[in-house]
Design a protein with these regions (language model features):
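Phosphate-binding/catalytic loops
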Residues: 91, 97-161
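Conserved active-site segments centered on acidic
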Residues: 3-88, 153-161
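Hydrophobic structural packing positions in well-ordered secondary structure
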Residues: 15, 66, 93-94, 144
Length: 161
C-alpha cells in the first residue's frame, strides 16, 4: 500500500566518497525492501561526507559486485550530505567511525539522534572497511548485507515495518 510521504521511512546511507560503500548499501537495501514488497514504505538514498567524488557514478567494484550477485544497481551520482538531508531523513547511516565523526560535525551534533553506524544494527561496533583502499568488495558486501539485514530486523522490532 502506498504510504503518504510523511509516514515513509527515509534512509540515507553515508560513506566518505559516496561511490563504494554507501552506493552498495543503497542498492542492497533497496533490493531487500523490494523483495519484501515494502518499496512503497521507504525513501532510500546515499551521500558522501567529502566532496572528492561529487558527480561520479558508483565505483566499478560496486557495479561488478552487484552484477555478480544479480542485485540491480540503483543509478546514482555522488553528492555531499547537507543540512536539508538531516531534516528530511529519519536514519542517517554511516559506515565507519570517521563517517560518524564527520556527520556529527556537519549535522550540528545530531540533536534528533538520527546518526547510526551500519554494523551497530548487527550488534557490532566494527567499521566497514573502505574498499577504495582495500580492494575487497567481497568483504564490503558481506558487511553491508549483515548490516542491512540487521537494520530490517531493528525496524521490525520497533514496529516500523
Amino acid at each position: 500500500e502506498m504510504r503518504g510521504y510523511a509516514t515513509m521511512i527515509k534512509v540515507l546511507f553515508i560513506c566518505h566518497g559516496n561511490i563504494c560503500r554507501s552506493t552498495l548499501s543503497e542498492s542492497v537495501f533497496t533490493h531487500k525492501v523490494n523483495t519484501l514488497g515494502l518499496e512503497n514504505m521507504f525513501v532510500i538514498d546515499s551521500a558522501a561526507t567529502s566532496r572528492e567524488e561529487i558527480g561520479n557514478p558508483p565505483h566499478r567494484g560496486t557495479v561488478n559486485k552487484l552484477r555478480e550477485l544479480g542485485i540491480p544497481l540503483v543509478p546514482h551520482r555522488a553528492r555531499q550530505v547537507t543540512l536539508d538531508d538531516y531534516d528530511k531523513f529519519d536514519y542517517i547511516i554511516g559506515m565507519d567511525t570517521a563517517n560518524i565523526r564527520n556527520l556529527n560535525r556537519m549535522l550540528k551534533h545530531d540533536p534528533e539522534g538520527k546518526i547510526y553506524k551500519l554494523l551497530s544494527f548487527a550488534g557490532s561496533g566494527r567499521d566497514i572497511a573502505d574498499p577504495w583502499y582495500t580492494g575487497d568488495f567481497d568483504e564490503t558486501y558481506r558487511d553491508v548485507e549483515e548490516g542491512s539485514e540487521g537494520f530490517l530486523n531493528y525496524l521490525r522490532e520497533k514496529g516500523k515495518i
